[in-house]
């Protein structure tokens, strides 16, 4: 055994052993040594995008997963930890353009590099189950599901809004639109309506919402709330304003302007209606109003992102058209509003400025009437300033509303809904904020949509026998549109219906399709004849899913939807894919920058900056190493390329070893909280591991000499050491179960301090106690630092007794070791703590009282005979003087 810790040697030795023994290959129905089925546990991290390099967020995510894997495996579980690649998507196209190589070439090279990095981390990944989203053997099943969903009517085609770049002649993703302009061309972006395929996720809205509330107790409350809000169930009233506006002698929308509201109690307060720029009434009005036409064109340039719509400036313009209020018959002016989405509800909203904050601001901006129809006792309404109580439906009562005056919210809604229904102009309705999932992308690097466009037959599904429709991998995007539109070898085909020449669909699928079911493919690797097979029934549903909070809505919602569709197709037998969810916190680091005269900031990596600290170690100034000139301290932010504050995990591993990187990321913060990077913390983790090695080396002779011992016949010093070791083991085991890995590391540090500080003789019993303590310590530390503990376990001979540490039984707390012959009891005099005593654990009440009264620290607070002595067994003596 080497006397010095060499991470490179240690980690190579461990990696060689794990590779030679195929240590992490998981099999279904694995047996324990008694031939009984082990309990399965499926723990999975959200699959990464193959960007080419791991970042510290990856390291943290995968280490959490790996720690869980190792702890559970030592506890007798059959554990699966797979890995794959979210390999399709826009970043690969952008990189391909920048490097003038096909996305496939760039992607596969990145995957190989990242696999090497993952291997260096010592992750317990079963690589035999690896999946890659851009390989035909995977995306064939995306296409197969598409056809099944199309057949069942779950997938359908309709027009949808997209961001169109008129210079590059291409559709842009939302993130490619910057301040209303194309990221590459700088052109003003237009909203265009084009045919796209959609999945009817709204058909599952109620079930998705119900299961959030009742079937996901192992998910963070924050994520469940985000999902519920995204689904956005609203119970309200859909009703119509009538009109006689005609276009080409035909009533527009049958003479009705439909809206939906959750506040039907305020219907008498309507002073305007707003419609989307694409609404038929807006289109009609613009024909004779050039100014309105120009405004509508401006609205169409705006974002199609709902979040952007919520924060942008609300603008409007009157159409000159009026509709009739269904209950009063009064005329209500119609406006075009840039905040109204044609894709949401009926593309129109009622405006009640007195009781809606957005409408209030809009009415003030354009000097529209404000009519109060809800009153709260003791409050005074003003048209000048908005107050939150204006929208209060809990305490409000109808006023200025005729027959509805005095009704509360629910009474008014029920009565008004009934009246509208009787008029044939409305009814109660449940709506959802959730929209159907548009899965078409006008991009190259994605799963080809398996449809063929025939001049005679229209859109025809590709026959199942012809799957997969293989994406050509030789295209190099140039930013001027989808290269598949020019790829004749891909485009040319015959119509499956009529046999005439036809063209393939060039849209590809949203990459969220790839990530909606990949975790099931891990369970059925290399299944050529089915999307999933019986092995999926063994592993699923997943026991623990791990990933960032940024995926709380879309990915997780789509995966839940996809699972329910697969269930309805008879492919799976469960409702929810992920039993437990852990959303790990972000990794943060300091930021440094310089700002030029134009306000542009240049960011510098923390490794290139030198700090000046005050006497308390706080940074007061910073300079750049290469020019010795000042830089601004920007504060702590998430590690990112844009702020240039990332830390290269590989550099940390090369310098300190993977165990140090793992130990620091687990110790610095609880898994679900943010982690602040600290170079000093990394060095501290490395020093700890060197101490571990040194202690083990120094005890190697004792361990070699250790024999089985009767732990019932120990000296006080030996008992004390065993008690402390088992007490810390108890804490660490509890923390592992709670996924509080930072306090697990704390427990390991505490145990090393305890072992190092023990002063035992050279007896056989002492050797046995130290051997037991060190074997427990190595097993506690193993899930976090698997390399060093694996090698020390082998070197110290524990493997000969217990087998490989990976499968060594988790140490059990010895209740006998925790027992103490003596206990400490606190003493209070008149309710104030005045001292403590040590008595035999089984001391009687009289002995405890006598010992307490004899205590020097207590005697000075007592005069004469105490009035009363209360003994709380094992804890406290309370003396009333």
Swiss-Prot record:
> What SUPFAM superfamilies does UniProt report for this protein, alphabetically?
Anticodon-binding domain of a subclass of class I aminoacyl-tRNA synthetases, Nucleotidylyl transferase, ValRS/IleRS/LeuRS editing domain
Q: Which reaction does it catalyse?
A: tRNA(Leu) + L-leucine + ATP = L-leucyl-tRNA(Leu) + AMP + diphosphate
ATP-binding in keyword set: yes
Q: What is the first-listed, main subcellular location in coarse terms?
A: cytoplasm
UniProt-recorded Gene Ontology molecular function terms: aminoacyl-tRNA deacylase activity; ATP binding; leucine-tRNA ligase activity
Which PROSITE patterns does the record cross-reference, listed alphabetically? AA_TRNA_LIGASE_I (PS00178)
| Positions contributing to ATP binding | 641
Question: Which keywords, in A-to-Z order, does the entry hold?
Answer: Aminoacyl-tRNA synthetase, ATP-binding, Cytoplasm, Ligase, Nucleotide-binding, Protein biosynthesis
Q: Where is this motif: 'KMSKS' region?
A: 638-642
Q: Which GO terms describe its cellular component?
A: cytosol
Q: Which GO terms describe its biological process?
A: leucyl-tRNA aminoacylation
Q: Where is the motif 'HIGH' region annotated in this sequence?
A: 48-58
- The cysteines joined by S-S bonds are none
Say if the entry is tagged with keyword Heme. no
Q: Write down the NCBIfam families for this protein, in alphabetical order.
A: leuS_bact
- HAMAP family in alphabetical order: Leu_tRNA_synth_B
Which family does the entry's similarity section mention? Belongs to the class-I aminoacyl-tRNA synthetase family.
- Put simply, this protein is called Leucine--tRNA ligase
What organism does the UniProt record list as the source? Herminiimonas arsenicoxydans
Identify the gene encoding this protein. leuS
């Amino acid at each position: 055994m080497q006397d010095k810790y060499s991470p490179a040697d240690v980690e190579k030795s461990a990696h060689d052993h794990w590779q030679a023994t195929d240590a992490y290959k998981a099999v279904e129905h694995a047996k324990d040594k008694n031939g009984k089925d082990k309990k399965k546990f499926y723990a999975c991290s959200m699959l990464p995008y193959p960007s080419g390099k791991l970042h510290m967020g990856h390291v943290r995510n995968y280490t959490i997963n790996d720690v869980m894997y190792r702890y559970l495996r030592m506890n007798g579980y059959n554990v699966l930890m797979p890995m794959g690649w979210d390999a399709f998507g826009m970043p690969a196209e952008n990189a391909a353009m920048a490097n003038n190589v096909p996305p496939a070439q760039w992607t596969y090279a990145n995957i190989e590099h990242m696999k090497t990095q993952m291997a260096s981390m010592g992750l317990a990944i079963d690589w035999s189950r690896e999946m890659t989203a851009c390989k035909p053997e995977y995306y064939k099943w995306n296409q197969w599901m598409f056809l099944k969903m199309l057949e069942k009517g779950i997938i359908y085609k309709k027009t949808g809004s997209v961001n169109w770049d008129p210079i590059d002649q291409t559709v842009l993703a939302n993130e490619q639109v910057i301040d209303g302009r194309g990221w590459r061309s700088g052109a003003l972006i237009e909203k265009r309506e084009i045919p796209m395929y959609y999945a009817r996720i709204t058909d599952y809205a109620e079930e998705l919402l119900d299961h959030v509330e009742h079937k996901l107790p192992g998910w963070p409350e924050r994520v469940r709330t985000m999902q519920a809000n995204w689904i956005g169930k609203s119970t309200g009233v859909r009703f119509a304003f009538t009109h006689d506006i005609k276009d080409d002698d035909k009533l527009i929308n049958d003479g009705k302007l439909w809206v939906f509201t959750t506040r039907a109690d305020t219907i008498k307060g309507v002073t305007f209606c707003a419609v989307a720029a694409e609404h038929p009434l807006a289109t009609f009005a613009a024909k004779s109003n050039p100014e309105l036409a120009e405004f509508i064109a401006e609205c169409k340039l705006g974002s199609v992102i709902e979040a952007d719509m919520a924060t942008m400036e609300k603008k409007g313009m009157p159409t000159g058209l009026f509709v009739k209020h269904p209950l009063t018959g009064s005329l209500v002016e119609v406006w075009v509003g840039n905040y109204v989405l044609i894709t949401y509800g009926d593309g129109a909203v009622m405006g009640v400025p007195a009781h809606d904050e957005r409408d209030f601001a809009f009415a003030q901006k354009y000097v529209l009437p404000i009519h109060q129809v809800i009153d709260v006792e003791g409050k005074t309404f003003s048209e000048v300033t908005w107050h939150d109580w204006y929208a209060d439906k809990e305490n409000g009562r109808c006023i200025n509303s005729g027959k509805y005056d005095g009704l509360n919210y629910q009474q008014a809604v029920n009565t008004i809904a009934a009246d509208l229904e009787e008029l044939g102009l409305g009814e109660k309705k449940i709506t959802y904020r959730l929209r159907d999932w548009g899965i078409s992308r006008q991009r190259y690097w994605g799963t080809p949509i398996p449809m063929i466009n025939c001049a005679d037959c229209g859109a025809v599904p590709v026959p199942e026998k012809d799957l997969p429709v293989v994406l050509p991998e030789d295209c190099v995007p140039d930013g001027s549109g989808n290269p598949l539109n020019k790829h004749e070898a891909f485009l040319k085909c015959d119509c499956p219906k009529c046999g005439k020449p036809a063209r393939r669909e060039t849209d590809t699928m949203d990459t969220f399709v790839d990530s909606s079911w990949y975790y099931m493919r891990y369970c059925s690797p290399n299944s050529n004849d089915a999307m999933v097979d019986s092995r999926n029934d063994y592993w699923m549903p997943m026991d623990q899913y791990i990933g960032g909070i940024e995926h709380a809505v879309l990915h997780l919602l789509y995966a839940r939807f996809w699972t329910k569709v697969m269930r309805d197709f008879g492919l799976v037998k469960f409702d929810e894919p992920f039993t437990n969810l852990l959303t790990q916190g972000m990794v943060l680091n300091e930021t440094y920058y310089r700002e030029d005269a134009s306000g542009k900031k240049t960011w510098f990596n923390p490794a290139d900056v030198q700090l000046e600290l005050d006497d308390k170690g706080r940074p007061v100034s910073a300079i750049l190493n290469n020019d010795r000139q000042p830089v601004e301290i920007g504060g702590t932010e998430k590690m990112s390329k844009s702020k240039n504050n990332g830390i290269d995990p590989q550099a940390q591993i090369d310098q300190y070893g993977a165990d140090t990187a793992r130990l620091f990321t687990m110790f610095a913060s609880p898994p679900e909280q943010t982690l602040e990077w600290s170079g000093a913390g990394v060095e501290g983790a490395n020093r700890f591991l060197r101490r571990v090695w040194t202690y083990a080396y120094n005890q190697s002779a004792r361990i070699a000499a250790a024999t089985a011992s009767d732990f019932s016949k120990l000296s006080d010093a030996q008992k004390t050491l065993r008690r402390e070791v088992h007490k810390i083991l108890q804490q660490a085991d509890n923390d592992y179960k709670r996924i509080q890995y930072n306090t697990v590391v704390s427990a390991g540090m505490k145990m090393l301090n305890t072992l190092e500080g023990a002063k035992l003789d050279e007896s056989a019993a002492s050797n046995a106690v130290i051997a037991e303590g060190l074997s427990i310590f190595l097993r506690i530390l193993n899930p976090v630092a698997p390399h060093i503990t694996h090698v020390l376990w082998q070197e110290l001979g524990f493997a000969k007794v217990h087998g490989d540490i990976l499968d060594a039984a988790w140490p059990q707390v010895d209740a006998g070791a925790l027992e103490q012959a003596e206990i400490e009891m606190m003493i209070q005099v008149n309710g104030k703590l005045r001292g403590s005593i040590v008595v035999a654990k089984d001391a009687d009440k009289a002995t405890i009282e006598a010992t307490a009264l004899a205590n020097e620290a207590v005697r000075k607070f007592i005069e004469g005979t105490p009035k009363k002595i209360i003994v709380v067994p094992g804890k406290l003596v309370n003396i009333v003087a």
